[in-house]
Amino acid sequence: MPKVSVIIPAYNRAHLIGRAIRSVLNQTYQDFELIVVDDGSTDNTEEVVRSFNDNKVIYIKHERNKGAPAARNTGIRAARGEYVAFQDSDDEWLPEKLGKQIKAFKTASTEVGLVYTGFWRIEGDKRTFVPSPNITPKEGAIHDALLKGNFVGTPNTLVKKECFEKAGMFDEKLPMLEDWELWIRISKCYCFKYIDEALAISYYNPGSLNKPRSLMEAQTLKLMLDKHFEDIKRNRGLLASYYRRIGHLLCLNGQIAQGRGYLKKAVMTYPIDVKSFLLALISLFGQRSYNKAIQGYKRIIRCC
């Protein structure tokens, strides 16, 4: 049995997936299987995967497109390894990524269920190291820190398979951010360990959040708030930040009345939060005024 199961979900990524697969096969640590879950692709993704002709590579295909969370869950169910790693079809690993994570697990407490590394975020000509040095704590019992935002990532993680048995798998009902939500659940049961070194590269398309995606994020945050409300409400400032983010995204997406309602909730929950107050005030002047004000005050967007 392989020690590690690496899972790559793919949907119409024939032009990119070769790079991701090569970066996995070129690891210095070689005790792994690579499970590629083709999520109903209509291009030649299968042809590219099979061209590697490597007995480590296992190809599974969904008859129809089900989304990345479902594809990853299919991979988890098929995994034979003690540990599970995730790679995205358009990203890549540095050669020592798996080896250093396995070494970290060997020296870690049995309470550690996930080891993650730093990674480079490439967006156009801009390269950023993630997670930010300002984020603390990065390891140990980090459940409260993760409730505030996702600094863990996905292609840079190595997870004990037992974590999925205890905390569950990816939530297929979430429109996006399903990795963050899973890490929140796992962090309630296990400690995390961090390697302060960039061992993966994630590529992002440059550009701002578009309207359909911003609405998806608002819907996702609503679901996450419902799911983890008991933990989030213990910190009134944190609860207000969820309300504020949801409200702001809804307002940006043309749902000014509903968005204003969430912004009012944010103000009522944590009255000393200036950001919530300013956004709620701007929303009172209607959709056009809100859009113009936000375009004119980029700082507000960055704070939300």
Show the residue positions of the predicted features.
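Conserved nucleotide-sugar donor-binding catalytic segment
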Residues: R77, N134-M224, Y243, L250, ...
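Acidic helix N-cap motif at the loop->helix transition within catalytic regions
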Residues: H15-G18, D43-S51, E92, E96
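A conserved acidic beta->alpha catalytic loop
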Residues: S23, Q30, D38-E47, R64, ...
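N-proximal low-complexity "stem/linker" segments adjacent to membrane-targeting elements
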Residues: M1-L25
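Conserved donor NDP-sugar-binding/catalytic core segment of glycosyltransferases
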Residues: E96-F129
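Glycine-rich, basic loop-to-helix element that forms the pyrophosphate-binding segment
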Residues: H62-A79, K100
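C-terminal subregions of glycosyltransferases and related glycan-biosynthesis enzymes
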Residues: M1, Y204-C304
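Short aromatic/hydrophobic "clamp" motif used to bind/position activated sugar donors
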Residues: V84
